[in-house]
Structure formats: structure tokens, C-alpha cells
């Protein structure tokens, strides 16, 4: 199997770049990948490649063997047909010649058989004819033996054809099983690709979650920084307020001191009524100082009012920060809950993926065992095929030997046939000459018997054997006979030499699409698959119908105090009012300091 995966699934699946380009006949070859990079081929891929090459070589060897057996069978049958035709022609020719000889012998006059030389020649002819008949019987026996051998060769050819058909059926079943294995591998590859896509999606979601965690941490860090800044700012404002309160306390203590002084002045006003006139000059300065102090007090009151407004703004700003902090805490808690839920769902998915990966490993081990069993079965088939090929080779060797023996015997038969045909031609010529001589002698004897009027008595005993006469003079060449009947068709000639290869023809047009094949057999029912992972949450449902109106709720709590408005711009100074009436005389001031001594007076004349 071409099986591999990336990362932790290194030894799970090995996949090729060309898929599948040709997965209909051969098993796919996939390059192993390790962590997204192409790695070396695994041992299983090499075994699969060697198995494919061996199966292809076995297919080629089977086709060549079938072609060779068919060619040899055709050659053997052609030679046997030619031999049978030659033998049938020879038998027909011999039969015709024997029939013609018998007719000629029957046409002879029985009275002419008195001649001893003719009797001897007839006996010799009979002996030769018997020899020819014996040779023909031997030929018939040889033909019967050859027919038996031909029957044996036909039986062996039938055995070879049946075995080749069995081998082709076994190879077809092997190819069908390999095709089924390839289909199962394709389905398994599709499942593994889906698992890889899911793992990639999980990686992307984990990256998104980590990025969200980093963003939340950065937001919390920024919030902490802003809270620290606001705390420092509040601390500075508190310092300023402490300083202002200290100044106010100082002013209050001064005011109390002044009131005490004024009380002492009131108590001492009765006592110092005498010196009020002396210190009226200092009252103007003191009144001016009092007016200045009142103005400074008014300014201090204005500053205190501004500080109070600033404190109100700061308090509203702190309230806003508290609300923002509450919102951030709520969002962080919500994000934490969401992250916890996502991590729990991811843990569930990881557990389901671990279960699926375990099932994948079990399926891979099962397929590995199945492939090993298939390899063992293919090895057994290869051994049986090699044994069958060896037996077929031995049978073909013996067939070649028998064919060579048959060819030798056919050559001997042809030579004997040529010799017998020559001897028959010679004997037929001699017989024709003897028959002509016998006809001439018969005519001569007839004429003599007609001329003789003396009645012969009983024939006496035969006389002694005379001397052998001299060979007669060769008679004249006879006239040319009529044209004979057309003979039977001769045997087909030998196959001529193979011609030179012709030029390649033009590329033909693409033929029409073939008819759709028959539907394949229904596969066996698969085992129960493992439970699928938990599905994603469905889309949000439609808005339901409005429910009945509920009872009026209880009044809610009062809302927080609103933010103070922005302080307006200081208005332009108003017009100076009219001078008011003269006020009541103020409190008598304290006695002034004693003045410097005056100049010496003039001495009166008195």
C-alpha cells in the first residue's frame, strides 16, 4: 500500500503525485511526506512497484506463451493437413493405377497366358503389387500411429488451452482483487485527506485561540497600566487636596486668631476709647488691609469652589473608570468562559480524533495484513505459474521433438513415394509394352488359327524351358495422348518471408465512445464504522412568536448619578453698580504705635 501522513502520521499513509493518473489497472504509487516535505519512498511502495512489474512481466509472458502455442498449433495442423492431403492424393493415384492395371489385365486374352515369360513377369508384377500393398499398409499403419500422435497432441493442446484459460481466469481474479484493493486504497486516501483537512482546520482554530489569548492578555495589561496611571493621578490629586486643606486650615486658624484679636479689641475698646482718636490715622491703613484681606478671602473662596468642581469632575471620571473596569471584568469573564468552553470542545474533538486515529491505525494494520496475504497468494500463484510454465515448456519440447520426427518421417515418406511413383511409372510402361506385344501375338495367333485347318489333338506335355530370348528393340514413341483431367488442388505452399515494415499510416480519428459496461458485482457488506465526531452547532433558529404580555415588573433601582456637565465659560464682567450709601462706622481699631517725638517747641517769652 502507498500509505503516509504528515507529522505524527508519518508511517500511516504513502501517497503519489500522479494519482491516480493510472489507478484503474495498477496500484497507485505515492511519495511519502514527512512534515510537509517529500521524503524517500517506503518499503511498501517499493514492494508494490516490484509486484506491479512482476505482474506485468507475467502478463507479457503469458501473452507470448499463448501466441507461441497458437502459432505452433497452427503450424502443426497445417503440416498434418498437408501430409494427410499428400497421403490421400497418393492413395487415390495408387488406387487409380491399380484399377487401370486390373482392367488391363482383365482385358488380356486368357489364351495368351501360355507364354512363360509373360507369366513370370505377371508373377513379378503381382509380387511388386503385393509389396506395394504391404508398403501401403505400412503407410496406413504409420498414418494411424500419426493420427494417434495427432490425437495426443490435440489432447495436449486442449490441456494447454484449458490451463491457459484457467491461468487467465486466475489472473483476471487477481487483477479484480487488485482493482478492489486499489479502490479501497482510494477511499482510504480520501478519508485521510479529509482527516488532514480537519487537522489543518483545528490548527487554524488553535492559532486563532492563541491569538485571542494574546490579545486578551495585552488588553488586560493595558487596563492595568491605565489603572496604575489613574491611581497615580488620584494620588497626586489627593496630595493637592491635602495641600489645599492645609492652606484652608491655616486661613481658618488665621481667621480665628483675627476674631480673637477683634474680641480683645472689643474688650479693650472701652479702655482704649481715649486713644481712639490718636489711632484714627492708623484705621485707614487697617481698613485698607481689611479690604485687601477680604479680597484675598474672596479669591480663596473662588479657588475653593474651583477645587470643588475639579473634585466633582475627578469623582465622575473615577466613576467612569469604575464602570469601564466593571465592563472589562465582565468581558474578561465572558472571554474566559468562552475559552474554557472552546478548550473543552477542543479536548472532546481531540479525544474523538484520537479514537478515529486509533481506528485508522487498526484499519491500516488490517489492510497491511490483507496486502501481505495477497502478496503471499501472488507468490503462490507465481510459483504455480512457473511450475505450469516449466511443464508446458517440457511438453512443448517433446512436441517439437515429435514434430521433428514427423517431419523426418514425412521426408522419408516423400522419398519413398517418389521412388514408388518412379517404379510404378517404369512398371506401367513395361506393362503397356507387354500388352502391345501380347496384342500383336494374339492377332498373329488368330491369323494362324484361321489359316490352319488341321485339327489338333490333345496337347502334349509342356516342353522344356527354352532359353531366354534377347531383349527386343525399343519400339517407336507413341503418339501424344489426349489431355488428362484436371488434377486436385495441390497443398498450400510454405509461408513466404516477412515483408519489410511499411510506412506508418496517418493517425486515425478518435473512435466513438464505447458502450457502457455491465454493472459490477455487489460488494460484501462492510463492518460497522466508528461514531463520527460531534457536529458543529447549527445556525440560529428563526425568531419565535411573541409570548403573552407579562405582569408589570417591580420598579428598578435608581440609576447612578449622572456625570456633571462641563463648566461653562467665565462671563464678561458686569457694569459697575452705583455707589451705595455710607456704611456704619466700623469697629474701632487697636491703638496705634506711639509716634516719634515731636520737635522742640519755641520758648515763650514768659
Curated annotation (Swiss-Prot):
Q: Which cysteines are joined by disulfide bonds?
A: none
Glycans attached where?
A: 115, 182, 224, 257, 313, 337, 365, 400, 430, 451
Q: Where is the composition biased (Low complexity)?
A: 497-516
Annotated coiled-coil positions are: none
Q: Which residues lie on this side of the membrane: Extracellular?
A: 78-606
Compositional bias of kind Gly residues: 526-535
Region described as Disordered: spans on this chain: 455-606
Record key words, sorted: Collagen, Endoplasmic reticulum, Glycoprotein, Golgi apparatus, Membrane, Repeat, Signal-anchor, Transmembrane, Transmembrane helix
Domain Collagen-like: residue ranges: 456-558, 559-601
Bias-annotated ranges (Pro residues): 548-558, 591-606
List all topological domains (Cytoplasmic): 1-56
Cell compartment(s), UniProt: Endoplasmic reticulum membrane; Golgi apparatus membrane
GO CC annotation terms, alphabetical:
collagen trimer; endoplasmic reticulum membrane; Golgi membrane
Main subcellular localization, coarse class?
Answer: endoplasmic reticulum
Q: What does this protein do?
A: Seems to protect cells by scavenging oxidative molecules or harmful products of oxidation.
Q: What is this protein called?
A: Scavenger receptor class A member 3
This chain's source organism reads Mus musculus (Mouse)
Task: Please spell out the taxonomic lineage of the organism that makes this protein.
Answer: Eukaryota, Metazoa, Chordata, Craniata, Vertebrata
Amino acid at each position: 500500500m502507498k500509505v503516509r501522513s504528515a507529522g505524527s502520521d508519518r508511517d500511516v499513509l504513502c501517497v503519489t503525485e500522479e494519482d491516480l493518473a493510472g489507478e484503474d489497472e495498477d496500484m497507485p504509487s505515492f511519495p511519502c511526506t514527512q512534515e510537509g516535505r517529500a521524503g524517500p519512498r517506503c518499503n511498501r511502495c517499493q514492494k508494490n512497484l516490484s509486484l506491479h512489474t512482476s505482474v506485468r512481466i507475467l502478463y507479457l509472458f503469458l501473452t507470448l506463451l499463448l501466441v507461441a502455442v497458437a502459432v505452433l498449433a497452427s503450424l502443426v495442423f497445417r503440416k498434418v493437413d498437408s501430409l494427410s492431403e499428400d497421403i490421400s492424393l497418393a492413395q487415390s493415384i495408387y488406387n487409380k493405377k491399380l484399377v487401370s492395371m486390373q482392367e488391363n489385365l482383365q482385358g488380356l486374352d486368357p489364351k495368351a497366358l501360355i507364354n512363360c515369360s509373360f507369366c513370370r513377369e505377371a508373377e513379378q508384377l503381382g509380387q511388386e503389387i503385393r509389396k506395394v500393398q504391404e508398403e501401403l499398409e505400412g503407410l496406413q499403419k504409420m498414418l494411424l500411429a500419426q493420427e494417434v500422435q495427432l490425437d495426443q497432441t490435440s489432447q495436449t493442446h486442449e490441456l494447454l488451452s484449458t490451463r491457459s484459460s484457467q491461468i487467465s481466469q486466475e489472473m483476471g481474479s487477481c487483477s479484480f482483487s487488485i482493482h478492489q484493493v486499489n479502490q479501497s486504497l482510494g477511499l482510504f486516501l480520501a478519508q485521510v485527506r479529509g482527516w488532514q483537512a480537519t487537522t489543518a482546520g483545528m490548527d487554524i482554530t488553535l492559532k486563532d485561540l492563541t491569538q485571542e489569548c494574546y490579545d486578551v492578555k495585552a488588553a488586560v495589561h493595558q487596563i492595568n497600566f491605565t489603572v496604575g496611571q489613574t491611581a497615580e493621578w488620584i494620588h497626586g490629586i489627593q496630595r493637592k487636596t491635602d495641600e489645599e486643606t492645609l492652606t484652608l486650615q491655616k486661613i481658618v486658624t488665621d481667621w480665628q486668631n483675627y476674631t480673637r484679636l477683634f474680641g480683645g479689641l472689643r474688650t479693650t475698646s472701652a479702655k482704649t476709647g481715649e486713644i481712639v482718636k490718636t489711632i484714627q490715622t492708623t484705621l485707614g491703613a487697617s481698613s485698607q488691609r481689611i479690604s485687601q484681606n477680604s479680597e484675598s478671602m474672596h479669591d480663596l473662596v473662588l479657588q475653593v469652589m474651583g477645587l470643588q468642581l475639579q473634585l466633582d469632575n475627578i469623582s465622575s471620571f473615577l466613576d467612569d473608570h469604575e464602570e469601564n473596569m466593571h465592563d472589562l471584568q465582565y468581558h474578561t469573564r465572558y472571554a474566559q468562559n468562552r475559552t474554557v468552553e472552546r478548550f473543552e470542545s477542543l479536548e472532546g474533538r481531540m479525544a474523538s480524533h484520537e479514537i478515529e486515529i486509533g481506528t485508522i491505525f487498526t484499519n491500516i494494520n488490517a489492510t497491511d495484513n490483507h496486502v501481505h496475504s495477497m502478496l503471499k497468494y501472488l507468490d503462490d500463484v507465481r510459483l504455480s505459474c512457473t511450475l505450469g510454465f516449466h511443464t508446458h515448456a517440457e511438453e512443448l519440447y517433446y512436441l517439437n521433438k515429435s514434430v521433428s520426427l514427423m517431419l523426418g518421417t514425412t521426408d522419408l515418406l516423400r522419398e519413398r513415394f517418389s521412388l514408388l511413383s518412379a517404379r510404378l511409372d517404369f512398371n506401367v510402361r513395361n506393362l503397356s509394352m507387354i500388352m502391345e506385344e501380347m496384342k500383336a501375338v494374339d492377332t498373329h495367333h488368330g491369323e494362324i488359327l484361321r489359316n490352319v485347318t488341321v485339327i489338333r489333338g490333345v496337347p502334349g506335355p509342356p516342353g522344356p524351358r527354352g532359353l531366354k530370348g534377347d531383349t527386343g528393340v525399343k519400339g517407336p514413341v507413341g503418339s501424344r495422348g489426349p489431355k488428362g483431367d484436371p488434377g486436385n488442388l495441390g497443398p498450400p505452399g510454405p509461408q513466404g518471408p516477412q515483408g519489410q515494415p511499411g510506412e506508418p499510416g496517418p493517425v486515425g480519428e478518435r473512435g466513438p465512445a464505447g458502450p457502457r459496461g455491465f454493472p459490477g458485482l455487489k460488494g460484501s457488506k462492510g463492518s460497522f464504522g466508528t461514531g463520527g465526531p460531534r457536529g458543529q452547532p447549527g445556525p440560529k433558529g428563526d425568531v419565535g412568536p411573541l409570548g403573552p404580555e407579562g405582569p408589570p415588573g417591580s420598579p428598578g433601582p435608581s440609576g447612578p448619578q449622572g456625570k456633571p456637565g462641563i463648566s461653562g465659560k467665565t462671563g464678561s464682567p458686569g457694569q459697575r453698580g452705583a455707589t451705595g450709601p455710607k456704611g456704619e462706622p466700623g469697629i474701632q481699631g487697636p491703638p496705634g504705635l506711639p509716634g516719634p517725638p515731636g520737635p522742640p517747641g519755641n520758648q515763650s517769652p514768659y
